[in-house]
Amino acid sequence: MVTTPDGSPVAMVHCNNCTSDLNAWVGLFKQYQELLGVPVDMNEVFSKLYNHALKGDADCGGLIAYNYISGEPVTGLAEGRPMFVRSANDHFNLANFMRANLYASVAVLKIGNDVLFKNEKVQVDRITGHGGLFKTKGVGQRILAAAINSPISVMETAGEGGAWGIALLAGYLVNNDEKLSLADYLDKKVFAGNTGVEIAPTAEDVAGFDKYIVTYKAGLAIEQAAVANKK
């Protein structure tokens, strides 16, 4: 059993991939700008593309992406092949392309959390996001809120990335002279009344992501075929 340092049980959804494949796609747009002789500011490139994704269809127009640089146990893949898939009649444009890849970055997380929230009836007070996905203000937060149908809070330093959660647990063990419980340590020492900025999911986004994930799950056979046939 996985527990916190103070012995509380942990329900954990482990994902091997997040934004590595998405970053590779953004890198192509960087190369295109360089071909045009346009000075490249990567913060601007990410901001423009991420915010443009929010103009896409809530279900990404039928487009799906698999960000599987490596395998994903949650979906039964021991290996992965990054892949973008569309049908000829899907709504293919830049906004939907970017949105599909943003959805892909948290799709496995959604599948795992759906088991916890919908099947196991796990309830949470709030979810705090941290990592590079949240560096572009509001976008990753909105995508994750739609994925797990829950308000998402981010702190001011959310975009810095790193193993934030495990660092907090280490801090609890090393810097807890008052011998507080983990819950009290988080409330009094880490958040100290500052729960960050919260974004709640919209009904349209949630319905769109749910539709996307149905197509995503159906297409896992394509990912399996790629693993079997592309070395």
Predicted regions and their residues:
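Active-site core segments that coordinate phosphate-bearing ligands/cofactors
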Residues: 1-128, 133-231
